[in-house]
Amino acid sequence: MPAIHGLNKTTLLDYPGRVAATIFLGSCNFRCPFCQNSSLVLHPADEPVIPEEEVLSFLKKRRGILDGVCISGGEPTLASDLEDFICEIHALGYPVKLDTNGTRPDVLKHLAERGLIQKAAVDIKACPDNYPSLTGMMHPDLTAIQETVSFLLHGNLDYEFRTTVVKELHNENDFIQIGQWLKGAKAYYLQAYRDSDEVLQPGFSSYSLEELEHFRKILLTTIPLVEIRGID
């Protein structure tokens, strides 16, 4: 079963419209400088592991209080036995939302076609041209990410796209290009960056609400629902 490195026992944010628990798995194939979970990305083997039985027991006891489970990371589609783990969660009656960077479309498609995930949230790091600098990878697999985007745009799985917006890394042109790339998407969220010691490269800053609202208006020309998250 996948190594579980974190459990947020109650969240109203991670699975919109549901009272959910979020499970964090380790490892990632990106090295985004603004990543909020650097320890899970860089040194997952050094992080404490929560036994699967403990997590499933918690979920069993919380039935009737929780009504959803979010699986995040890291990049959860890299985890071994992810499918079996989700089957265990489904057996308890929970719908599952999967957070992903979109680099493993075959895993996403398989889980969706088996009815094992009810929603996907895909992190759009930047416009395609800027993926190398914002993912820390010289040659990120943009073909795979495009396959994920196309699958969601033209499929039946509920989804959202989202971008953590960093002042030093994103600008107006990014969102003009992203708006064209994701044209017709059902939902897109601009997430305000928050600096912390857990960030892979701390020291970045966030745009103001007014600046994020400007990006939102750009995106609304091609995407019908665009909202801002993370502003107090």
Where are these regions (language model features)?
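A C-terminal junction/extension of Radical SAM enzymes
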Residues: 213-232
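Conserved beta-strand termini and adjacent loop/short-helix elements that scaffold enzyme active sites
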Residues: 7, 191-193, 228-231
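A secondary-structure boundary/capping signal
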Residues: 24, 72-74
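Conserved alpha-helical substructure of the radical SAM core
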Residues: 38-69
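Conserved AdoMet/S-adenosylmethionine-binding subsite of the radical SAM
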Residues: 56-68, 77-209
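Short, charged low-complexity linear segments at domain edges
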Residues: 1-18
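Canonical Radical SAM [4Fe-4S] cluster-binding loop centered on the CxxxCxxC motif
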Residues: 15-50
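SEC14/CRAL-TRIO lipid-binding/transfer domains and related phosphoinositide-recognition modules
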Residues: 3-8, 27, 41, 53-54
